[in-house]
């Protein structure tokens, strides 16, 4: 197993649209700027709008009726409140216990 005689850092050229090769990975220089067309001058846009209004066909417009507008001020509902905890013990309540009748023992039989 030997090392190759070629250096892996070959091709480190200037970044003027040229390609860099570092450690076997190619890295391209920065991207070129994208050129786009300019918008039409305002004079042309107004002519198109005038043609739209002059024709018999209606152009699409944004609805301006009161029903379609978003209300300016919406009232939020109040924040939810915690429920009161159920009372576990009532000290004022008088408890009435069952008082057995005096002849209850006659119901049960004694076994010998």
Curated annotation (Swiss-Prot):
What one GO molecular function would you report for this record?
protein kinase inhibitor activity
Iron-sulfur keyword on record: no
User: Which controlled-vocabulary keywords does the entry list?
Assistant: Cell cycle, Protein kinase inhibitor
Presence of keyword Cell cycle: yes
Question: Among the record's GO biological process terms, what is one?
Answer: regulation of DNA endoreduplication
Q: Which domain of life is it from?
A: Eukaryota
InterPro entries hit by this protein? SMR (IPR040389)
Q: How does it assemble?
A: Interacts with CDKA-1 and D-type cyclins.
Query: What does the protein in this record do?
Result: Probable cyclin-dependent protein kinase (CDK) inhibitor that functions as a repressor of mitosis in the endoreduplication cell cycle. May inhibit CDKA-1/CYCD complexes during S-phase, preventing the re-initiation of DNA replication.
- By what name is this protein known? Cyclin-dependent protein kinase inhibitor SMR6
